[in-house]
Structures are given as structure tokens and as C-alpha cells.
A protein has these predicted regions:
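A generic structural signal for residues embedded in beta-strands
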Residues: 36, 84-85, 224
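Short Fe-S-cluster ligation motifs
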Residues: 232-236, 240-275
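Structural signal for conserved beta-strand scaffold positions within catalytic alpha/beta enzyme cores
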Residues: 6, 51, 154-156, 206, ...
Length: 275
């Protein structure tokens, strides 16, 4: 069992959890993820690690309520326990002094992006950060990213704060010498940024946490096409070359499960059980 030592709502429907997990904290590096299960009947939920405190023996994850299982997780309180926490999984992000790194985060994935940005900063990189969300009220970790980055830009889909959308990056890429780009967020965000950086030949790394079950590559649920190869996000990633990922295929596969997620969420809201 893994105890929740800290739980706080960052914005509506997005919550931060700090779990007591000394064994995982001791091994965690930025870019890795965990798979948690709330109880015996629970689904496996993959979440990118947003922080680790070896001294306290804790790891931090941030969860967005989008379905039955994440809604159930969000209902837990400090002091509650979950059954399983498997990790750290996946390959750590490559960390060295690249020069100038552009870190683009969207939605809930700004949280693990901050974890990576801290590590890039410690390696001596100059950081340009972009924090994005659907609307101003959904933005998270703006102040924290501002404290790490040399420059920070804010973007929202509806233009309620900062730039509207990510098209402003086209101009930024023209005037800045950027050596590496890290993108964490919705699939469409990673696809858009990868398309914008492609003409400049800037190495662009995307963090893929698609559908996962076992986290060890045996189930094949997390397969992605990268270049001409089929790879598995849980063991080969989760970081991949954004210019090689087949985003159209990935988005189509993820949409296959949308109806089931909606049905499970309705059952959960009604107090029923869906398997």
C-alpha cells in the first residue's frame, strides 16, 4: 500500500498527489513514469512522475480527471492509500548541456515538464519555457516555471491569457537559436510543435504516455510507429523523436477507447461499477 502524504487541487479537475514511496523515489529520474492502481478492481493508470524527494521518500504525480479511474483517484484524501504503484518505468530523459532548450508543456503535463526543466537548468542549459492550457483557469505551474526558465511564454487555446494557440512559436523559432525542444502535453500539441520545428531541423523530443496496461512491453497496448519501426512507449520511451512519430495513427488508436471511457465514467457517477 502507498500512502498519500500530500493532496491538493491545482485548478478544477487537476490535482497533485505526493505518495510515500521511498523505493521508487530513490531510483526516479526525470522523464520516467509510474502505473498506479487504486484497489483490486481498479484500472492501471499511467502517470508521468512530476517530482521525487529522496530525503522524504516520496514521489509526486499530477492527475487530470478525465474518466472513471482518474475521478476515483481525485476523490482520495491525504492519509488514504492506494494498492499498487509500479515504477519508475521507462527510460529517463537524456540530460546534458545542449545549449538552449525550448520546453513546451500543455495542460496537466506542465507538471512533469517542470521536473525535466529543473534538471536541464542544473546541467547549465538556457531554458525557454512555454506553459499552455485550454483557458486561463486551467493553467498550472506558471510561477514555478518562471523561476526556472530564462524566458517564459504563456499560451491558451482561447486566448484568455498570453498568446492564442501555438502559432507564435513560428516567429520564436526564426529569431532564437534553439538547440533542443522538449514537448509534453496533448497529442495534438506535440504534433503541432513537431511540425513547426521540422523545417529548422531542431531535435524535438515528445513524451508519449498512450494507453498502457502492464508497463513492461508484454501487452503491446502502448505501441507507436516511429519512423519505419513499431516501438513500445513503456520500454522504448516514453521519449521519442517527434519528427518520426506517426501522430495520425496514434490519435486514431487513442480515439478507439473514448466510448468505453465515457460509459465507465457514467457508471462511476451513478454509483455503479463498470469493468
Amino acid at each position: 500500500m502507498y500512502k498519500i502524504v500530500t493532496r491538493r487541487e491545482l485548478v478544477p479537475h487537476i490535482s497533485l498527489f505526493e505518495f510515500s514511496a521511498a523505493d521508487i523515489a530513490a531510483k526516479t529520474k526525470p522523464g520516467q513514469f509510474v502505473i498506479l492502481r487504486i484497489d483490486e478492481d481498479g484500472e492501471r493508470i499511467p502517470l508521468t512522475i512530476a517530482g521525487a524527494n529522496v530525503g522524504k521518500g516520496t514521489i509526486t504525480v499530477v492527475c487530470h480527471e478525465v474518466g472513471k479511474s482518474t475521478k476515483q483517484l481525485a476523490s482520495l484524501k491525504e492519509g488514504d492509500c492506494i494498492l499498487d504503484l509500479l515504477g519508475p518505468l521507462g527510460k529517463p530523459a537524456e540530460m546534458k548541456n545542449f545549449g538552449t532548450v525550448l520546453c513546451v508543456g500543455g495542460g496537466v503535463m506542465v507538471a512533469p515538464l517542470r521536473f525535466q526543466a529543473q534538471a536541464f537548468h542544473q546541467k547549465g542549459n538556457k531554458l525557454i519555457g512555454v506553459v499552455g492550457a485550454r483557458t486561463e483557469s486551467a493553467l498550472i505551474f506558471q510561477d514555478e516555471m518562471r523561476g526556472i526558465c530564462d524566458e517564459l511564454y504563456v499560451a491558451t487555446d482561447d486566448g484568455t491569457k498570453g498568446y492564442k494557440g501555438l502559432e507564435f512559436l513560428s516567429e520564436l523559432l526564426k529569431i532564437k537559436k534553439i538547440d533542443r525542444v522538449i514537448v509534453m502535453g496533448p497529442i495534438v500539441t506535440m504534433k503541432t510543435v513537431s511540425e513547426l520545428t521540422r523545417p529548422y531541423g531542431i531535435p524535438t523530443i515528445v513524451n508519449l504516455i498512450p494507453i498502457m496496461v502492464d508497463g513492461m512491453g508484454m501487452c503491446g497496448a502502448c505501441r507507436v510507429t516511429v519512423g519505419d519501426r513499431t516501438m513500445f512507449a513503456c520500454v522504448d520511451g516514453p521519449d521519442f523523436d517527434g519528427h518520426q512519430v506517426d501522430f495520425e495513427e496514434l490519435m486514431a488508436r487513442l480515439k478507439m477507447f473514448t466510448p468505453q471511457e465515457k460509459i465507465a465514467f457514467v457508471f462511476h457517477e451513478a454509483g455503479g461499477r463498470s469493468h
